[in-house]
């Protein structure tokens, strides 16, 4: 047997809050896509720099890169 709604009182309506009203302009550009590549090159460059940073940290942790004048001891 299927469920049947008798009246519309069970439907929830969203209430408007001050925070929602103040944040609404930030979401006004939702769904709009700028033509072209946009900031993809900047994002790729940033990801490459982050990968270099992570590899340097990994090499220091594995002691494959020794820094002069800085004692590296994990004891």
UniProtKB/Swiss-Prot annotation:
Topology versus the membrane: Single-pass membrane protein
Keywords associated with the record: Chloroplast, Membrane, Phosphoprotein, Photosynthesis, Photosystem II, Plastid, Thylakoid, Transmembrane, Transmembrane helix
Residue ranges annotated as transmembrane are: 41-61
Q: Please give the superkingdom of this protein's source.
A: Eukaryota
Compartments where located = Plastid, Chloroplast thylakoid membrane
GO-annotated molecular function:
phosphate ion binding
InterPro entries named in the record: PSII_PsbH, PSII_PsbH_sf
Known post-translational modifications?
Phosphorylation is a light-dependent reaction catalyzed by a membrane-bound kinase; phosphorylation occurs on Thr residue(s) in the N-terminus of the protein.
Share an example GO biological-process annotation for this protein. Answer: protein stabilization
Tell me the residues on which Phosphothreonine occurs: 3, 5
**A Pfam family reported for this protein in Swiss-Prot or TrEMBL:** PsbH
| Cellular-component GO terms for this entry | chloroplast thylakoid membrane; photosystem II
Main localization of the protein? plastid
Q: Whom does it interact with, and what assembly results?
A: PSII is composed of 1 copy each of membrane proteins PsbA, PsbB, PsbC, PsbD, PsbE, PsbF, PsbH, PsbI, PsbJ, PsbK, PsbL, PsbM, PsbT, PsbX, PsbY, PsbZ, Psb30/Ycf12, at least 3 peripheral proteins of the oxygen-evolving complex and a large number of cofactors. It forms dimeric complexes.
Q: Which HAMAP family match?
A: PSII_PsbH
**Protein task:** One of the components of the core complex of photosystem II (PSII), required for its stability and/or assembly. PSII is a light-driven water:plastoquinone oxidoreductase that uses light energy to abstract electrons from H(2)O, generating O(2) and a proton gradient subsequently used for ATP formation. It consists of a core antenna complex that captures photons, and an electron transfer chain that converts photonic excitation into a charge separation.
Of which family is this protein a member? Belongs to the PsbH family.
Write the protein's name: Photosystem II reaction center protein H
Please name the source species. Pinus koraiensis (Korean pine)
Gene name, per UniProt, is psbH
